[in-house]
Amino acid sequence: MRVRKRKGAEEHLENHPEYVIMNPEDIKGHWKEVFGNDHPIHIEVGSGKGGFITGKALQNPEINYIGIDIQLSVLSYALDKVLESNAPNVKLLRVDGSSLTNYFENGEIDLLYLNFSDPWPKTKHEKRRLTYKDFLETYKQILPEHGEIHFKTDNRGLFEYSLASFSQFGMTLKQVWLDLHASDFEGNVMTEYEEKFSKKGQVIYRVEAFF
């Protein structure tokens, strides 16, 4: 999700250390201590403006959530959502999805979400797609054995690519939705993009896959 540069975004993040972890490399292996409990930890890579991660945190207080985004301004908007919700089970990180092993120990994360990732449609940009094999290798390291990825998108091309990428990597497709909003799936938390696209009548695709 690309947004205009937000004035004061960095200062805004720095002023809320209770939610924004500025030195995540120092916490590797100790995330349960940060949350102060032994609850499962779920992360969203590319958390955008925080609608999904905040909604999930409110929906599931027994689960800890970490929203990850590399864009400073975007993360500052996510912080607004977290502050508004007052959810105690959310943390935010400004890091790149390719470097997650620098911040999380093997098996430290219980589940990983990818929502409306940039499709990078050009073949020469394949390695930038968050479901490319190199990213999957990174995710596999921080997830437990048979750890799951839950992926949503409105982009059919990226969805088909991701299904193939998961399968070629040796993952198992647990369940696939070719029209999520027309299904009987319960508990769906929509992202900002999802709300926008669904109002236009666009189909939303979803898959749950595990290693």
UniProtKB/Swiss-Prot annotation:
Catalytic activity: guanosine(46) in tRNA + S-adenosyl-L-methionine = N(7)-methylguanosine(46) in tRNA + S-adenosyl-L-homocysteine
Signal peptide (UniProt feature, chain positions): none
InterPro entries on file: SAM-dependent_MTases_sf, tRNA_(Gua-N-7)_MeTrfase_Trmb, tRNA_methyltr_TrmB_bact
Residues that hold substrate according to the record: K122, D154, T191, E192, Y193, E194
Active site: D118
NCBIfam families: PRK00121.2-2, tRNA (guanosine(46)-N7)-methyltransferase TrmB
Protein name per UniProt: tRNA (guanine-N(7)-)-methyltransferase
Lineage: Bacteria, Bacillati, Bacillota, Bacilli, Lactobacillales
Gene: trmB
